[in-house]
Amino acid sequence: YFLMGFQLFASGSYEIFNFPVDARNLALHNSASAYDGILLNNNPASLSKRANGNTYSYFYLPANIHFTGFQNVHNSSSGVRANKISFMSYGAIIDGETEKKSYAYDILLESGVKKEIKNLTSVGLSAGYLFSSIAGYKSQLLYSNIGIRSRMLRKRLGVGLSLENIGFLLKSYTDV
């Protein structure tokens, strides 16, 4: 019953949050990982200290769906900082009655930080903004992800915990 409640809650989410941004996340079915990663993902505490630079992503899916993403990760003595922008276009939507064409898309901006504590535990926080438009109806929200990760047994075993998509809806699709 507990797991079913979470599945029902997640079914009303924005699709761009569930979309994997690289091949590794696609293989893991977009699940969070306690291992180091070079991209800002579900658990911001899993950002690698070795990550540095820019990453570009582009996916083309059936039904004319396009995903484009850009991430910048910077490593400094105070921790790891990451910024990302993502755009997902769901293509044209044609009204069956009026034959009017409209579009659906999501734009996501996110920034995150990770701090390592005694080379054993990492704490991460990310915050973002999402703008979504479907056939002229628009929605906006602010969200955050909080994560913690610990490495044990000479860094062979990783354990992580993340709270994801903690959000505040600024404007619903149905607000006029």
Language model: regions and residue ranges:
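Hydrophobic h-region of N-terminal signal peptides that target proteins for export
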Residues: 2-10
